[in-house]
């Protein structure tokens, strides 16, 4: 979708292409789409006043907007069409019902740790839910070999909100 750096977009596209050739399919939780839409709408609202964020984080959506000459209206359009783009262009499968993972995540160790570092409990719950989903798909197995892993959770792991150690969980 090219809302990060050109290098990141190229890396993501390569990851998608290679993964497809290896037979992987792509699945996204409905909650993930909603999180992305909320982020895009926030960025759209603040686009005209985002001077500092652009200079602090070169991977911020604001810099992609400058590079691609996107307006607030463009970001709103991207947000409105996000699910359709993921399904029809990128061929992702959407999991619409996530209550089972949401319930498990709410009482998980991960949620209690992540909520200390995320801006909202909703964002922390989403992250914990994704971890619970992957753990269930993997069958609680530890990764031994890259090629034998049946489920990956891919995200942009760089966060400028707060720094915390992944080894906590």
List PLM regions with ranges.
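Active-site-proximal, substrate-binding regions of enzyme catalytic domains
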Residues: 2-151, 159-169
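Catalytic binding pocket for nucleotide-activated donors in carbohydrate/polymer assembly enzymes
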Residues: 154
């Amino acid at each position: 979708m090219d809302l990060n750096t050109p290098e990141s977009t190229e890396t993501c596209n390569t990851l998608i292409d290679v993964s497809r050739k290896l037979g992987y399919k792509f699945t996204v939780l409905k909650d993930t789409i909603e999180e992305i839409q909320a982020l895009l709408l926030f960025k759209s609202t603040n686009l005209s006043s985002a001077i500092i964020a652009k200079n602090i984080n070169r991977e911020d959506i604001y810099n992609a907007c400058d590079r691609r000459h996107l307006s607030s209206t463009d970001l709103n359009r991207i947000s409105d069409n996000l699910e359709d783009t993921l399904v029809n262009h990128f061929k992702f499968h959407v999991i619409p019902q996530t209550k089972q993972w949401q319930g498990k995540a709410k009482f998980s160790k991960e949620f209690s740790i992540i909520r200390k570092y995320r801006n909202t409990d909703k964002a922390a719950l989403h992250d914990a839910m994704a971890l619970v989903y992957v753990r269930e798909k993997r069958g609680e197995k530890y990764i031994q070999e890259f090629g034998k892993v049946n489920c990956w959770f891919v995200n942009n792991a760089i966060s400028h909100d707060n720094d915390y150690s992944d080894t906590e969980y």
